[in-house]
Amino acid sequence: MASNRGQLNHELSKLFNELWDADQNRMKSGKDYRISLQGKAGYVPAGSNQARDSASFPLFQFVDEEKLKSRKTFATFISLLDNYEMDTGVAEVVTPEEIAENNNFLDAILETKVMKMAHDYLVRKNQAKPTRNDFKVQLYNIWFQLYSRAPGSRPDSCGFEHVFVGESKRGQEMMGLHNWVQFYLQEKRKNIDYKGYVARQNKSRPDEDDQVLNLQFNWKEMVKPVGSSFIGVSPEFEFALYTIVFLASQEKMSREVVRLEEYELQIVVNRHGRYIGTAYPVLLSTNNPDLY
């Protein structure tokens, strides 16, 4: 393994595979959704908003929305996606209704086996308090507490917005958006134009049933040269992984190497003080671990 990739974390690999197996809300490839990978994406120079289009059709060919929205954690998650102002530098205003939606989502995921297992693990590590309510408050602060991305500006971002919704830097640079449901919904609204897959070095092309992908896309005219995302997994699965990695370290940037099913991944979590700045999976066989 290359030295800059770090050593495999066996403890987290075991835990994350247990969480993967417990993820009962995960959508199944070929049954609950279908994707079309099409062509391999081209190189996009830094700062460019031009990308060769190697995909004539959307990435998502089909998603069983009825099933998606019948699952409480997905339904409450989707209700949060329209609560944010896309541009950093524009102050966020959080309404009482949005606070209630945040709490409904946390209540829903805390009922799942995945989050109960994650909570139990964190309690054993003295990284979370044993009561569910205290853990919920901790999750709320980590993920939903607003902060400023630029020094001196008003609160304009939070971990949830960056990771799951996506945001822009002065309307010129695409940041975040590492979630497959948001990708699908934005693609459906014609806000996302999928440009092609970014291949792993040891594999000529991904498979249609791969559940971790590197993608290139335009979002509202801004290019994301490489965006990595789990596909099909539940919101609670991603919340669990990223929260565990965040709480395990005080480092500005945590990179935990894990083996999850067939994938060797780096789970990257960047902290913004006491909050999550960004979080995403990186397929280690790609040559660009520094996705943003």
From Swiss-Prot:
One of its GO terms (molecular function) is lyase activity. It is an enzyme of class 4 (lyase). Changing G232A: No change in affinity for RNA substrate. Optimum pH is 7.5. Keywords: Endonuclease, Hydrolase, Lyase, Manganese, Metal-binding, Nuclease, Nucleus, RNA-binding. Its main location: nucleus. Disulfide bonds: none annotated. One of its GO terms (cellular component) is nucleus. Changing E167Q: No effect. Loss of activity and affinity for RNA substrate. SUPFAM superfamilies: EndoU-like. Its EC number is 4.6.1.-. CDD domains: XendoU. Changing E161Q: No effect. Loss of activity and affinity for RNA substrate. InterPro entries: ENDOU (IPR039787), EndoU-like (IPR037227), EndoU_C (IPR018998). GO terms for biological process: sno(s)RNA processing. It is found in: Nucleus. The keyword Manganese applies. Pfam families: XendoU. Its cofactor is Mn(2+). Changing P235A: No change in affinity for RNA substrate. Residues 8-285 form the EndoU domain. In vitro, optimal manganese concentration is in the range of 5-10 mM. The active site is at H162, H178, K224. Poly(U)-specific endoribonuclease involved in the processing of intron-encoded box C/D snoRNAs, such as U16 and U86. Releases products that have 2',3'-cyclic phosphate termini at the 3'-end. Belongs to the ENDOU family. This is Poly(U)-specific endoribonuclease-A. It comes from Xenopus laevis (African clawed frog). The lineage of its organism: Eukaryota, Metazoa, Chordata, Craniata, Vertebrata.
